[in-house]
């Protein structure tokens, strides 16, 4: 039993089908996105100022939104505050590969693909942001080790290792 879960940056609730049978609180700063979310408990808020008491959640989940957090250091501190002792923070996101060849290939490939998709969907601004965010977000192995968690595990997965999964235990 994973206990109660905070879905940080829940947006439209993409994780709903996997988590619908659990006690989940969806948090997102965008009220319009939350209105499309199927979770019962929905709260408007940001990761940097979590509106919960200390030790409120057994687990915190954050999927493909960490690069959109304005102050990740503050958000890490807030997640640590609301997690119960022994609780886990599970973070899934994207970054550039570490290998120089893969990094260059990934940069060229994502530039072409994301700009193409942006043009087709008439959302070029959003896809440009996604492309740029892969460069200005520091490598997770450097950034995520600056916290109060123990048993930190960061695993790169997928083609070119540009997707990573971070699991932290409080």
Question: What does each model-identified segment do?
Answer:
Residues 1-3:
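Conserved alpha-helix/loop element of class I SAM-dependent methyltransferases that forms part
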Residues 6-49:
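Class I SAM-dependent methyltransferase SAM/SAH-binding core
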Residues 15, 27, 95-145:
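C-terminal alpha-helical "lid/dimerization" subdomain adjacent to the S-adenosyl-L-methionine
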Residues 48-60:
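A short acidic, Gly/Pro-enriched loop at the edge of an enzyme's catalytic core
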Residues 59-72:
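A short SAM/SAH-binding and catalytic strip from SAM-dependent methyltransferases
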Residues 73-85:
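A short glycine-rich, Lys/Arg-flanked "PGG" loop and its adjoining helix->strand segment in the class I
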Residues 87-94:
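Conserved beta-strand signature within the Rossmann-like core of class I S-adenosyl-L-methionine
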Residues 148-150, 155-170:
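Core SAM-dependent methyltransferase catalytic element
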